[in-house]
Amino acid sequence: VAHLNGKKSIGIQPCDDDGLAIFGAIDIDPKNYTDFKPEKYLKIIEEKELPVIPIKSKSGGLHLYVFTKERVKASDIREFLEKLLFIFGLPAKTEIYPKQTSLETTEGKRSSGNFINIPYYNKNDRVAVDTSNNELKFETFMKVIELNAQTAKTLNNFGATLIQKALEGESPEFKDGPPCLGIICGGLEKNNTKLDDERDRFLYNYMVFAKKKY
Protein backbone atom coordinates (compact mmCIF):
# COMPACT_ATOMS: atom_id res chain seq x y z
CA VAL A 1 0.00 0.00 0.00
CA ALA A 2 2.83 2.40 0.88
CA HIS A 3 4.36 1.70 -2.54
CA LEU A 4 1.10 2.35 -4.40
CA ASN A 5 0.55 5.54 -2.41
CA GLY A 6 4.02 6.83 -3.26
CA LYS A 7 5.28 6.78 0.32
CA LYS A 8 7.92 4.07 -0.04
CA SER A 9 9.41 2.55 -3.18
CA ILE A 10 9.71 -1.22 -2.93
CA GLY A 11 11.98 -3.69 -4.68
CA ILE A 12 11.52 -7.46 -4.74
CA GLN A 13 14.00 -10.31 -5.10
CA PRO A 14 12.08 -12.88 -7.20
CA CYS A 15 13.86 -16.08 -6.10
CA ASP A 16 12.76 -17.53 -2.75
CA ASP A 17 14.59 -19.83 -0.33
CA ASP A 18 13.43 -22.88 -2.27
CA GLY A 19 14.80 -21.60 -5.58
CA LEU A 20 11.29 -20.87 -6.84
CA ALA A 21 9.69 -17.72 -8.26
CA ILE A 22 6.36 -16.47 -9.60
CA PHE A 23 7.72 -13.79 -11.92
CA GLY A 24 10.76 -12.70 -13.84
CA ALA A 25 11.78 -9.79 -16.05
CA ILE A 26 14.14 -8.67 -18.77
CA ASP A 27 15.66 -5.26 -18.08
CA ILE A 28 16.11 -3.38 -21.34
CA ASP A 29 18.59 -0.66 -20.47
CA PRO A 30 19.31 1.41 -23.61
CA LYS A 31 22.57 3.25 -24.15
CA ASN A 32 20.69 6.45 -24.99
CA TYR A 33 17.44 6.97 -23.10
CA THR A 34 16.59 10.11 -25.06
CA ASP A 35 16.35 8.20 -28.34
CA PHE A 36 14.92 5.00 -26.86
CA LYS A 37 11.80 3.80 -28.66
CA PRO A 38 9.97 0.85 -27.06
CA GLU A 39 7.78 0.34 -30.14
CA LYS A 40 10.33 -2.09 -31.60
CA TYR A 41 9.82 -4.48 -28.68
CA LEU A 42 6.08 -3.88 -28.41
CA LYS A 43 5.68 -4.89 -32.06
CA ILE A 44 7.50 -8.18 -31.46
CA ILE A 45 5.33 -8.90 -28.42
CA GLU A 46 2.21 -8.37 -30.49
CA GLU A 47 3.36 -10.26 -33.59
CA LYS A 48 4.57 -13.31 -31.68
CA GLU A 49 1.82 -13.12 -29.02
CA LEU A 50 4.39 -13.31 -26.23
CA PRO A 51 3.04 -13.75 -22.68
CA VAL A 52 5.10 -10.84 -21.37
CA ILE A 53 3.95 -7.50 -20.00
CA PRO A 54 6.01 -4.41 -20.94
CA ILE A 55 6.49 -1.97 -18.08
CA LYS A 56 8.27 1.38 -18.08
CA SER A 57 11.34 1.22 -15.86
CA LYS A 58 12.47 3.77 -13.29
CA SER A 59 15.46 4.75 -15.44
CA GLY A 60 13.42 5.25 -18.62
CA GLY A 61 14.00 1.88 -20.25
CA LEU A 62 11.66 -1.08 -20.38
CA HIS A 63 11.05 -4.13 -18.21
CA LEU A 64 9.46 -7.17 -19.85
CA TYR A 65 7.69 -9.18 -17.14
CA VAL A 66 6.48 -12.76 -17.21
CA PHE A 67 4.24 -14.12 -14.45
CA THR A 68 3.33 -17.69 -13.47
CA LYS A 69 0.19 -19.17 -11.94
CA GLU A 70 2.18 -20.88 -9.20
CA ARG A 71 5.74 -21.00 -7.93
CA VAL A 72 8.04 -22.55 -10.53
CA LYS A 73 11.78 -23.08 -10.65
CA ALA A 74 13.59 -19.77 -10.94
CA SER A 75 15.86 -21.50 -13.44
CA ASP A 76 12.85 -22.23 -15.70
CA ILE A 77 11.88 -18.56 -15.73
CA ARG A 78 15.45 -17.52 -16.50
CA GLU A 79 15.68 -20.09 -19.29
CA PHE A 80 12.48 -18.79 -20.88
CA LEU A 81 13.64 -15.17 -20.68
CA GLU A 82 17.06 -16.09 -22.07
CA LYS A 83 15.29 -17.47 -25.14
CA LEU A 84 13.44 -14.18 -25.47
CA LEU A 85 16.77 -12.34 -25.69
CA PHE A 86 17.28 -13.99 -29.08
CA ILE A 87 13.74 -13.20 -30.18
CA PHE A 88 14.16 -9.51 -29.26
CA GLY A 89 17.70 -9.33 -30.64
CA LEU A 90 19.07 -8.30 -27.24
CA PRO A 91 22.68 -8.86 -26.09
CA ALA A 92 23.40 -11.93 -23.95
CA LYS A 93 24.58 -9.60 -21.16
CA THR A 94 21.10 -8.06 -20.84
CA GLU A 95 19.98 -8.25 -17.21
CA ILE A 96 17.43 -10.93 -16.36
CA TYR A 97 15.55 -11.35 -13.09
CA PRO A 98 15.65 -13.48 -11.08
CA LYS A 99 19.41 -13.14 -11.23
CA GLN A 100 19.77 -16.04 -8.83
CA THR A 101 18.28 -19.53 -9.11
CA SER A 102 19.36 -20.34 -5.56
CA LEU A 103 20.02 -18.10 -2.57
CA GLU A 104 22.53 -20.50 -1.05
CA THR A 105 26.15 -19.47 -1.59
CA THR A 106 29.07 -21.82 -2.21
CA GLU A 107 29.96 -21.39 1.47
CA GLY A 108 26.53 -22.65 2.48
CA LYS A 109 25.32 -19.22 3.58
CA ARG A 110 22.20 -17.37 2.43
CA SER A 111 22.48 -14.57 -0.10
CA SER A 112 19.95 -11.74 -0.22
CA GLY A 113 20.01 -11.79 -4.04
CA ASN A 114 19.34 -8.91 -6.43
CA PHE A 115 16.20 -6.81 -6.21
CA ILE A 116 14.12 -5.24 -8.98
CA ASN A 117 11.94 -2.14 -8.50
CA ILE A 118 8.31 -3.18 -8.74
CA PRO A 119 5.88 -1.21 -10.93
CA TYR A 120 3.12 1.27 -10.14
CA TYR A 121 4.95 3.40 -7.61
CA ASN A 122 2.41 6.05 -6.60
CA LYS A 123 0.09 4.25 -9.05
CA ASN A 124 1.30 6.33 -12.00
CA ASP A 125 5.04 5.68 -12.17
CA ARG A 126 6.72 2.64 -13.80
CA VAL A 127 3.41 1.62 -15.34
CA ALA A 128 2.59 -1.17 -17.78
CA VAL A 129 1.74 -0.39 -21.39
CA ASP A 130 -0.10 -2.27 -24.10
CA THR A 131 1.41 -3.06 -27.49
CA SER A 132 0.27 0.35 -28.75
CA ASN A 133 2.28 1.96 -25.93
CA ASN A 134 -0.85 3.10 -24.09
CA GLU A 135 -0.45 3.18 -20.31
CA LEU A 136 -2.56 0.74 -18.31
CA LYS A 137 -4.30 1.57 -15.06
CA PHE A 138 -3.32 -0.56 -12.07
CA GLU A 139 -6.62 -2.48 -12.09
CA THR A 140 -6.18 -3.31 -15.78
CA PHE A 141 -2.59 -4.36 -15.15
CA MET A 142 -3.76 -6.91 -12.56
CA LYS A 143 -6.24 -8.37 -15.05
CA VAL A 144 -3.54 -8.58 -17.73
CA ILE A 145 -1.32 -10.51 -15.31
CA GLU A 146 -4.10 -13.03 -14.74
CA LEU A 147 -4.66 -13.45 -18.48
CA ASN A 148 -0.95 -13.92 -19.26
CA ALA A 149 0.15 -16.02 -16.26
CA GLN A 150 1.80 -19.30 -17.27
CA THR A 151 2.30 -22.71 -15.68
CA ALA A 152 5.73 -24.33 -15.66
CA LYS A 153 4.61 -26.59 -18.52
CA THR A 154 3.17 -23.86 -20.74
CA LEU A 155 6.22 -21.67 -20.09
CA ASN A 156 8.60 -24.40 -21.23
CA ASN A 157 6.43 -25.34 -24.21
CA PHE A 158 6.09 -21.72 -25.31
CA GLY A 159 9.83 -21.18 -25.12
CA ALA A 160 10.56 -24.35 -27.09
CA THR A 161 8.08 -23.37 -29.81
CA LEU A 162 9.61 -19.90 -30.10
CA ILE A 163 13.08 -21.33 -30.63
CA GLN A 164 11.81 -23.90 -33.12
CA LYS A 165 10.23 -21.17 -35.23
CA ALA A 166 13.31 -18.97 -34.94
CA LEU A 167 15.46 -21.86 -36.17
CA GLU A 168 13.68 -22.08 -39.51
CA GLY A 169 16.37 -21.52 -42.10
CA GLU A 170 19.17 -22.31 -39.65
CA SER A 171 22.62 -23.44 -40.67
CA PRO A 172 22.52 -27.27 -41.14
CA GLU A 173 26.01 -27.57 -39.61
CA PHE A 174 24.49 -26.96 -36.18
CA LYS A 175 21.36 -29.12 -36.46
CA ASP A 176 22.52 -31.21 -33.50
CA GLY A 177 23.90 -28.22 -31.62
CA PRO A 178 22.35 -25.79 -29.15
CA PRO A 179 19.66 -23.43 -30.50
CA CYS A 180 21.84 -20.37 -29.98
CA LEU A 181 24.26 -21.44 -32.72
CA GLY A 182 21.55 -22.23 -35.21
CA ILE A 183 19.83 -18.93 -34.55
CA ILE A 184 22.99 -16.88 -34.90
CA CYS A 185 23.99 -18.60 -38.15
CA GLY A 186 20.60 -18.73 -39.82
CA GLY A 187 17.44 -17.93 -37.94
CA LEU A 188 18.23 -14.38 -36.96
CA GLU A 189 19.58 -13.58 -40.41
CA LYS A 190 16.24 -14.67 -41.84
CA ASN A 191 14.39 -12.39 -39.44
CA ASN A 192 16.78 -9.48 -40.08
CA THR A 193 17.75 -9.45 -36.41
CA LYS A 194 21.23 -8.38 -35.31
CA LEU A 195 22.91 -9.23 -32.02
CA ASP A 196 25.34 -6.60 -30.78
CA ASP A 197 27.58 -9.20 -29.13
CA GLU A 198 27.22 -11.76 -31.93
CA ARG A 199 30.91 -12.60 -32.36
CA ASP A 200 31.71 -13.25 -28.70
CA ARG A 201 28.50 -15.17 -28.13
CA PHE A 202 29.08 -17.32 -31.21
CA LEU A 203 32.67 -18.16 -30.28
CA TYR A 204 31.73 -19.11 -26.74
CA ASN A 205 28.81 -21.32 -27.73
CA TYR A 206 30.73 -22.88 -30.61
CA MET A 207 33.50 -23.97 -28.24
CA VAL A 208 30.93 -25.52 -25.89
CA PHE A 209 29.31 -27.31 -28.84
CA ALA A 210 32.62 -28.51 -30.32
CA LYS A 211 33.86 -29.82 -26.97
CA LYS A 212 30.72 -31.93 -26.49
CA LYS A 213 30.54 -33.15 -30.11
CA TYR A 214 34.20 -33.94 -30.75
Please annotate each region the language model reported:
Residues 3-7, 84, 145-148, 188:
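Alpha-helix boundary/capping residues
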Residues 85-124, 145-158:
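Flexible helix-coil linker/hinge segments at domain or subdomain boundaries
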Residues 1-60, 67-83, 214:
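Signature for HUH/AEP ssDNA processing cores
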Residues 26, 118, 207:
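A residue-level signal for conserved active-site and pocket-lining positions in enzyme catalytic cores
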Residues 31, 61-62, 66-77, 114, ...:
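Modules that initiate DNA replication and primer synthesis
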Residues 6-13, 57-61, 89, 111-113, ...:
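Glycine-centered flexibility motif
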